[in-house]
Amino acid sequence: MFKLKINNFQLGFKLVQWPVTNHLLKHFYVFPINNKGGLAIKRIISLALFKKRLNKDKINNCHVWEEELPDGSYDMGFNGNFNHMEKRKSGYVTQKQFSEFKDANNQRLIKIETTLAIQGEQINKLTQTVEKQGEQINQLVQVVLLQGASKLENFKWSKKHKDKSLMPAWIVWKIFWWKV
């Protein structure tokens, strides 16, 4: 039994390492729950009650206690050698199994993120290539329009003036700007 005096409260408590049995141990001890003088009464409970409260399995030797709070509710604490169980849709799994499952999912998500990042970079490169090709196509279209306009005016000029001379450059520019 340890005795401790805090804020004019004399506290006594006893920690018991119990074997895994189904009988109820009734060792009470008191701990302060805040710095305003509030107290919580803790008692050691049996493993059966602990299993009933948590609805878990596979608990070995451990320290387990129940804390009765001033509002009438309770809080439970434990430490020692046991496998804490997490409930999932498929049933109960140990903390180790859950962490392995979580690590596997994290690795899978990291692979997906890296492939998405690589594909995003590839898409950016392809968009830049498409933009460059679009600019080249626009330049080629302008060249084709200029050549087509000059041939058309040369044809009209040669019919009108009955000679095969080339049309003046200012007429080509005038036709080009008029069509654009």
From Swiss-Prot:
<comment type="similarity">
    <text>Belongs to the UPF0134 family.</text>
</comment>
<dbReference type="Pfam" id="PF01519">
    <property type="entry name" value="DUF16"/>
</dbReference>
<dbReference type="InterPro" id="IPR002862">
    <property type="entry name" value="DUF16"/>
</dbReference>
<protein>
    <recommendedName>
        <fullName>UPF0134 protein MPN_127</fullName>
    </recommendedName>
</protein>
